[in-house]
Amino acid sequence: MMQDLRLILIIVGAIAIIALLVHGFWTSRKERSSMFRDRPLKRMKSKRDDDSYDEDVEDDEGVGEVRVHRVNHAPANAQEHEVARPSPQHQYQPPYASAQPRQPVQQPPEAQVPPQHAPRPTQPVQQPVQQPAYQPQPEQPLQQPVSPQLASAPQPVHSAPQPAQQAFQPAEPVAAPQPEPVAEPAPVMDKPKRKEAVIIMNVAAHHGSELNGELLLNSIQQAGFIFGDMNIYHRHLSPDGSGPALFSLANMVKPGTFDPEMKDFTTPGVTIFMQVPSYGDELQNFKLMLQSAQHIADEVGGVVLDDQRRMMTPQKLREYQDIIREVKDANA
């Protein structure tokens, strides 16, 4: 309930404020229109009074040169006539006195006190409107545009040499440190291709164990190796041992030799190696070598390792193949 009452009071107050604003605007507009509407009548009345005043002067003095008076009755001189009219005692002066604009200034006691025409309501209305409208306005705009033009003229003259000086300043340090010549990198020489290599792989027992010698010798013979030179096993081109040797097998324990008559011996593993280049196709010989190593590892329960005695990986096998191709290209 209180909110509704507050809302009603706010609305009523807003309406009252708007009504006051509209009434004030309407009243000021009405007064302004009436002031502009009465102004021509006042001007006609003042002009008519001036004409009657001039006719009286002509009748009293009888001089025809009084018409010069009418030429000087411009609106800008309305103030001078209004100041001269309140003194009827001096109408006997010669007519040329009214044509001179400086005589009212020479007789200040006569022009200072106009007792009859001072209370006119029309004079205070005309004076504030006409004086600022005609006298000061044409003089001020002529002086104002002249001063900024003269002031702005020297600015571009003084500002012109500044960029020129700034342009020459960075050019003064002629002996600027020149960048030191960068040494050209030495041409990278192509690594000479190897003309021979040794491909090595191992068959070893699991960590902490050893291979049985009798079982190992049987698996070696089943893989096609034949005991031969240097007391090690060789894989020849033909399974019966004829033809050149493709790759060989040695004991991992020094001196790396075998004794076929010894049945009860153990070893941590064996090493299979192939000299490249070799007889025939080296890549095919490498595949046969890998198959033999896997066969022996499966028979004795061991694992196939690379030349670093790490688990053989596909990446290492591709590396071996790349080495074989490089040697073949070098010997082509």
UniProtKB/Swiss-Prot annotation:
Give residue spans on the Periplasmic membrane side. 1-6
Kindly report every residue range on the membrane side named Cytoplasmic.
28-332
Span list, region Disordered: 42-190
Q: How does it sit in the membrane?
A: Single-pass type I membrane protein
Any transmembrane segments, and where?
A: 7-27
Keyword set, alphabetical order: Cell cycle, Cell division, Cell inner membrane, Cell membrane, Membrane, Transmembrane, Transmembrane helix
- Annotated GO CC locations: cell division site; plasma membrane
Q: Which GO terms describe its biological process?
A: division septum assembly; FtsZ-dependent cytokinesis
InterPro entries cross-referenced by the UniProt entry: Cell_div_ZipA (IPR011919), ZipA_FtsZ-bd_C (IPR007449), ZipA_FtsZ-bd_C_sf (IPR036765)
Bias class Acidic residues marks the residues at 51-63
SMART domains for the chain:
ZipA_C
Oligomeric form and interacting partners: Interacts with FtsZ via their C-terminal domains.
- What's this protein's function? Essential cell division protein that stabilizes the FtsZ protofilaments by cross-linking them and that serves as a cytoplasmic membrane anchor for the Z ring. Also required for the recruitment to the septal ring of downstream cell division proteins.
Protein name as annotated: Cell division protein ZipA
- Please spell out the taxonomic lineage of the organism that makes this protein: Bacteria, Pseudomonadati, Pseudomonadota, Gammaproteobacteria, Enterobacterales
